[in-house]
UniProtKB/Swiss-Prot annotation:
One of its GO terms (biological process) is negative regulation of mitochondrial membrane potential. May act as a scaffold to localize and regulate type I PI(4)P 5-kinases to specific compartments within the cell, where they generate PI(4,5)P2 for actin nucleation, signaling and scaffold protein recruitment and conversion to PI(3,4,5)P3. One of its GO terms (cellular component) is plasma membrane. Heterodimerizes with other type I phosphatidylinositol 4-phosphate 5-kinase. Its main location: cytoplasm. It is found in: Cytoplasm; Membrane. It comes from Bos taurus. Residues 1-24 are annotated as: Disordered. It catalyses: a 1,2-diacyl-sn-glycero-3-phospho-(1D-myo-inositol 4-phosphate) + ATP = a 1,2-diacyl-sn-glycero-3-phospho-(1D-myo-inositol-4,5-bisphosphate) + ADP + H(+). GO terms for molecular function: 1-phosphatidylinositol-4-phosphate 5-kinase activity; ATP binding. This is Phosphatidylinositol 4-phosphate 5-kinase-like protein 1. Pfam families: PIP5K (PF01504). The keyword ATP-binding applies. Keywords: ATP-binding, Cytoplasm, Kinase, Lipid metabolism, Membrane, Nucleotide-binding, Transferase.
Length: 396
């Protein structure tokens, strides 16, 4: 991938050793109850420990991300983002590897707008605790990681996907400013990793849609089509955490109650934006969690929720134009919608596939291969319309 102008900066990276010692000292004071609860919440996920095939890569990513976040802590961006911020490439040289941070000031501002403290971000992604791996049902060859607290999701990307993401980044940021309660997954960082003189590998950091995951009972990846959209469910009693697909959802509905109209409108706004970007093959992630009796209804937190939900809007009219809603009093509130009986985790992910020549040829081949059946490779307009129709048909 060609480095955007004005060209990369290269600096020696600070060491995360002091931060690792502090985090290890803090973690040593956690009690038995906390550790048991942590183990239960991670049922079906796998710690990337010594001996795991991805352990070395994980250690390099952790050390690199710790140092990269330290830069934004030492030099926090001010003012509005500039063209130079969007094109900045900062390369930090470590012993045996280099980690690049692309458009770092832009993502630092985005993290700050979400109320995410850089110290918390650094601690979660740094070397204090191992990442988690899960068995993905995706057909891509990407590697997937979760921070140990499952708050952040890391995924490897191809260079052309990174190019598309960075090309769309100014419009992505603008869309989130216009629609602060958008369902689009929040990308928090884009990085490259080069070991010794090897080839660069790219990865992104995102907020996990499925957080907090402790009581989630079902997970789905929805594209609104049928070809290759079935996953064999885990056997009864299995600890595997599987993300199921469209055909697994047949006969089910999402009961959002009064929130349904907001959800349908936000899907229209977000898919229209992705259509304008000429993007397709994105997914609606969904997960279910049954609400406890004391969690149903706004309750005593209504004033707090209302204040947080309208913060940043200048008027009721502006709030309506932005399609804001009453956010739940919960972590990761932007991706959580409460229905009468269930809490739903909802988000649009995988926003980097552009409808170019490669996808047009793939669409032609699939039309011949699967006559009369629906598949994911269609024009962005058709893709957006079909996914919105699926949502309307499966919500109440």
């Amino acid at each position: 991938m060609a480095a955007p102008s004005p060209g990369p900066r290269e600096i020696l990276a600070p060491s995360p050793e002091a931060g690792r010692r502090a985090a290890a000292s803090s973690s040593g004071h956690r009690g038995l109850l906390w550790r048991l609860r942590d183990k239960q919440c991670r049922l079906g996920l796998f710690e990337i420990g010594p001996g795991h095939e991805l352990h070395q890569v994980m250690c390099l990513m952790q050390a690199g991300l710790w140092a990269a976040t330290q830069v934004s802590m030492d030099h926090p961006p001010t003012g509005l983002p500039t063209e130079e911020d969007f094109s900045e490439v900062l390369t930090q040289v470590h012993e045996g590897f280099e980690l690049g941070t692309l458009a770092g000031p832009v993502f630092a501002r985005l993290r700050r707008s979400l109320g995410l403290a850089e110290e918390d971000y650094q601690a979660a992604l740094g070397p204090s605790r191992p990442y988690l791996q899960f068995l993905s049902t995706s057909k891509s060859k990407a590697s997937f990681f979760l921070s140990h607290d499952q708050r952040f999701f890391l995924k490897t990307l191809r260079s052309r996907e990174v190019q598309a993401l960075l090309a769309h980044l100014p419009r992505y940021v603008h869309h989130l400013q216009r629609h602060p309660h958008s369902l689009l997954a929040r990308v928090l960082g884009v990085h490259s990793l080069r070991v010794a003189r090897g080839k660069k590998k790219y990865f992104i950091v995102m907020q996990s849609v499925f957080y907090p995951a402790g009581r989630i009972s079902e997970r789905y990846d929805i594209k609104g089509c049928e070809v290759s959209r079935w996953v064999e469910p885990a056997p009864e009693g299995s600890v595997l955490v599987l993300v199921l697909k469209d055909l697994n959802f047949q006969g089910k509905t999402i009961n959002l109650g009064p929130q349904r109209s907001w959800f349908l409108r936000q899907m229209e706004l977000d898919t229209a934006f992705l259509r304008e970007l000429n993007v397709l093959d994105y997914s609606l992630l969904m997960a279910f969690q049954r609400l406890h009796e004391d969690e149903r209804g706004p309750g005593s937190s209504l004033i707090f929720r209302t204040a947080r939900s309208i913060r940043g809007a200048q008027s009721a009219e502006e709030s309506g134009a932005q399609n804001r809603r009453l956010l739940p009093d919960a972590p990761n509130a932007l991706h959580i919608v409460d229905g009468p009986e269930h809490r739903y985790f909802l988000g649009l992910v995988d926003l980097t596939t552009v409808y170019g020549l490669r996808k047009r040829l793939e669409q032609l081949w699939k039309t011949l291969r699967y006559p009369g059946r629906t598949f994911s490779t269609v024009s962005p307009a058709c893709y957006a319309r079909r996914l919105c129709q699926w949502v309307e048909a499966h919500t109440e």
